[in-house]
Every structure is written in structure tokens, then in C-alpha cells.
């Protein structure tokens, strides 16, 4: 039985995760904490793994607390940068048995979309990413879209492809999206949407569209459970769920 603490327990995703932990026979809810609650409750409750769906401005202090107290962490909170990853790696040097998983998306369909995009990238001259989310999302573009674009860019470099063709000389600010290592990324914020992504590839006489849709926050649950069940066997920092799904 894995004792699980949920941070952001009253949030949209957090409430879904709490409900899953409470009904999953292999998991036990040790603590359900939200803004203002004392993290020491995690230690007092002998928590094995923390699931964090909080806010970008609080996630780093949460992760540091977990690492210093020997608690594994499964992180779905967004707003990660390379500097933040380096901070976590540094903290983990003093706690080599602790595992931290940071995943830009826990929906297995989204993880597969990123993998499929990486496979397709070397075969097309052009690639662009469009992500769609609800209007309450704080960051743009999403971590999933950035991660997708980075994978495409890496695959293009390894294949020796040239820069994408684009003769645009004049444009309104933002019309061509954000440039992520040479891959344009566009963000849509729209009422009624949850989390969706399209990756569009094009080359001579043909195009390929890969699309993923999360219609409900239940879509994140299977991936989170996999992370919780496997994190103890994967010490150190893991970025993305791919390794835990055998896709790396």
C-alpha cells in the first residue's frame, strides 16, 4: 500500500486525484492539503509519495520540502524552466534515494502524441504546434506544447534538416506564434475547452495532423497512478512520463 499525499487537493485536478486515491485498492490517502495548510502533515502522516497539482509560484518550495524529508514527488504543476530542473537536481544530490517526476502532461494520449510527433518530424519540411486550453490556464504556451516542440526540434536536428521554410516578412505581433527552437507554437484560450493539442506537419503534396483531446480531468488519472506506483523505483529527476510507459 502506497501512502499518497495530494497538494492542491481542492483544485480541479486535485479533487479528481483525491477521489482516485480513496477508491484505488493499492493506494491510501495520507493527506489532502491545499493553500495555507502545513506541509509537516505529510511527514506526520508518513507519506510515501506526494502528488502536486498546485501553482507555479509554490511548487518549488513544495518539492524542496519533499526532497529534504525523503518523500517522492509526482508533479503535474506547470511553469518549469531549465533553471528549476537544475535546482531540483542539486537538491537531489543530498537525497539520492528520492524520486521526482515532473510531467508536462499525464494524459497517456498526450504522451503518445509527443512521441508520435518526434517520430514523424524527420520526414516533413514544416511542423507547427497548436494547443487549446480553458481560459483559466495561467501559462502560455502550455508545458505540453513546449515539450512537443522541443522533441520535434531535436528530431529535426538529429536528421540534419534545414530550418523550416517561412518567407513571412511582415506580421502582427504573435501572428506566427512563439518560436520554440525553430518550431512555431500557438496557444488558444477558449471557454468550453479542457486540454487539446494539434501537431501539423507538411511536406511536398501532403500533410499530417496528430491531435489529442482531453475532455475531462479524469484523463490525467491513469498517468498519475503510473507515476505514483513507479516513482520509488526511479530515484533522481525524471522529466516526462515516457520512461514510465516504456517509450524511452
From Swiss-Prot:
NAD(+) binds at residues 8-13, 34, 76-78, 103-106. Pathway: Amino-acid biosynthesis; L-lysine biosynthesis via DAP pathway; (S)-tetrahydrodipicolinate from L-aspartate: step 4/4. It is found in: Cytoplasm. Transmembrane segments: none annotated. It is an enzyme of class 1 (oxidoreductase). GO terms for biological process: diaminopimelate biosynthetic process; lysine biosynthetic process via diaminopimelate. It catalyses: (S)-2,3,4,5-tetrahydrodipicolinate + NAD(+) + H2O = (2S,4S)-4-hydroxy-2,3,4,5-tetrahydrodipicolinate + NADH + H(+); (S)-2,3,4,5-tetrahydrodipicolinate + NADP(+) + H2O = (2S,4S)-4-hydroxy-2,3,4,5-tetrahydrodipicolinate + NADPH + H(+). Its EC number is 1.17.1.8. The keyword Repeat does not apply. GO terms for molecular function: 4-hydroxy-tetrahydrodipicolinate reductase; NAD binding; NADP binding; oxidoreductase activity, acting on CH or CH2 groups, NAD or NADP as acceptor. This is 4-hydroxy-tetrahydrodipicolinate reductase.
Amino acid at each position: 500500500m502506497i501512502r499518497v499525499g495530494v497538494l492542491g487537493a481542492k483544485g480541479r485536478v486535485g479533487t479528481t486525484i483525491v477521489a482516485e486515491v480513496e477508491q484505488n485498492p493499492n493506494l491510501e490517502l495520507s493527506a489532502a492539503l491545499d493553500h495555507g495548510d502545513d506541509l509537516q502533515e505529510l511527514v506526520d502522516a508518513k507519506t510515501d509519495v506526494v502528488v502536486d497539482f498546485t501553482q507555479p509560484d509554490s511548487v518549488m518550495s513544495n518539492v524542496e520540502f519533499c526532497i529534504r524529508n525523503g518523500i517522492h514527488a509526482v508533479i503535474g504543476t506547470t511553469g518549469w524552466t531549465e533553471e528549476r530542473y537544475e535546482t531540483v537536481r542539486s537538491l537531489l544530490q543530498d537525497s539520492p534515494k528520492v524520486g521526482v517526476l515532473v510531467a508536462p502532461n499525464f494524459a497517456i494520449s498526450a504522451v503518445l502524441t509527443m512521441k508520435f510527433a518526434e517520430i514523424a518530424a524527420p520526414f516533413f519540411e514544416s511542423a507547427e504546434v497548436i494547443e487549446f486550453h480553458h481560459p483559466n490556464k495561467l501559462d502560455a504556451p502550455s508545458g505540453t506544447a513546449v515539450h512537443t516542440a522541443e522533441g520535434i526540434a531535436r528530431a529535426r536536428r538529429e536528421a540534419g534538416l534545414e530550418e523550416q521554410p517561412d518567407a513571412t516578412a511582415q506580421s502582427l505581433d504573435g501572428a506566427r506564434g512563439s518560436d520554440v527552437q525553430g518550431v512555431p507554437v500557438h496557444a488558444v484560450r477558449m471557454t468550453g475547452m479542457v486540454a487539446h493539442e494539434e501537431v501539423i506537419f507538411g511536406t511536398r503534396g501532403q500533410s499530417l495532423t496528430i491531435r489529442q483531446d482531453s475532455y475531462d480531468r479524469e484523463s490525467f488519472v491513469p498517468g498519475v497512478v503510473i507515476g505514483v506506483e513507479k516513482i520509488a523505483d526511479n530515484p533522481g529527476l525524471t522529466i516526462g512520463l515516457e520512461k514510465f510507459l516504456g517509450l524511452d
